[in-house]
Swiss-Prot record:
Signal peptide: none annotated. Methyltransferase required for the conversion of demethylmenaquinol (DMKH2) to menaquinol (MKH2) and the conversion of 2-polyprenyl-6-methoxy-1,4-benzoquinol (DDMQH2) to 2-polyprenyl-3-methyl-6-methoxy-1,4-benzoquinol (DMQH2). One of its GO terms (molecular function) is 2-methoxy-6-polyprenyl-1,4-benzoquinol methyltransferase activity. Its EC number is 2.1.1.163, 2.1.1.201. Keywords: Menaquinone biosynthesis, Methyltransferase, S-adenosyl-L-methionine, Transferase, Ubiquinone biosynthesis. It is an enzyme of class 2 (transferase). HAMAP family: MenG_UbiE_methyltr (MF_01813). This is Ubiquinone/menaquinone biosynthesis C-methyltransferase UbiE. GO terms for biological process: aerobic respiration; menaquinone biosynthetic process; methylation. Belongs to the class I-like SAM-binding methyltransferase superfamily. MenG/UbiE family. Pfam families: Ubie_methyltran.
């Protein structure tokens, strides 16, 4: 029984073999990549931009530093970090999904953001970078899709420089019960309909809603980061806890 538990994980509310989840998540993001930015604006009423700006403001990133935007998708954070680090710095936009990475590359190049940005297709559980390599790592709305989150957090810790910080921006648990009920109703009934109307894909957005519910809550994720080696781990609840920004340091 223990062995069986080790070999399975969740895909939304479903239990699947661990080796299957990566491919299933990949199909979701291949499907939604083309409409990803539009759907983000519609789903969050544009508030995701405020959450991301807060993340950048908390990053402490300075000119000349090296930043990893993990699960960076279409590059919203990468664009902001590119301006902060300047010509002497570097931002690596990494994503496991080829379609999302391609959309990010095309979007940033169309905006003229070139020169200090690199693109790497990478699995968060086994990052292909040297030890002590980055001044800052961010993962925005990506950790909940990772099969082995603890392994990914340890991998991030390894490639972070001493003195560096990790920022995890992710959906979390609303603080108030009325807000939680309203958010559930929106996520499970309205969100898939928006996905069907705009992206012709209700099923992928149903998975995204389920993946949010299965993601660890604020205190659990804080403990997971500490277990991975991060120190001074704190979090800020945003929009009533619908989203939380966790911060941890490597000393």
């Amino acid at each position: 029984m223990v062995d069986q538990e080790k070999e399975t994980t969740h895909f939304g509310f479903r239990t699947v073999a661990k080796e299957q989840k990566e491919g299933m998540v990949a199909e979701v993001f291949h499907s939604v990549a083309a409409k990803y930015d539009l759907m983000n604006d519609l789903m969050s009423f544009g508030v995701h931009r405020i959450w991301k700006r807060f993340t950048v403001d908390c990053s402490g990133v300075r000119r000349g530093q090296r930043v990893l935007d993990l699960a960076g998708g279409t590059g919203d954070l990468t664009a902001k970090f590119s301006r902060l680090v300047g010509e002497q710095g570097e931002v690596i936009l990494a994503d496991i999904n080829e379609s999302m990475l391609r959309m990010g590359r095309e979007k940033l190049r169309d905006k003229g953001i070139v020169g200090n940005v690199s693109y790497v297709q990478a699995n968060a559980e086994a990052l292909p970078f040297p030890d002590n390599f980055f001044d800052c790592i961010t993962i925005s709305f990506g950790l909940r899709n990772v099969t082995e989150k603890e392994k990914a957090l340890r991998s991030m810790f390894r490639v972070l420089k001493p003195g560096g910080r990790l920022l995890v921006l992710e959906f979390s648990k609303p603080l108030l019960e009325p807000l939680s009920k309203a958010y559930d109703a929106y996520s499970f009934h309205i969100l898939p309909k928006i996905g069907e109307l705009v992206a012709q894909d209700a099923e992928s957005y149903r998975y995204l809603a389920e993946s949010i519910r299965m993601h660890p809550d604020q205190e659990t994720l804080k403990g997971m980061m500490a277990d991975a080696g991060f120190e001074n781990v704190t979090y800020s609840n945003l929009t009533g806890g619908i989203v939380a920004l966790h911060r941890g340091f490597k000393f």
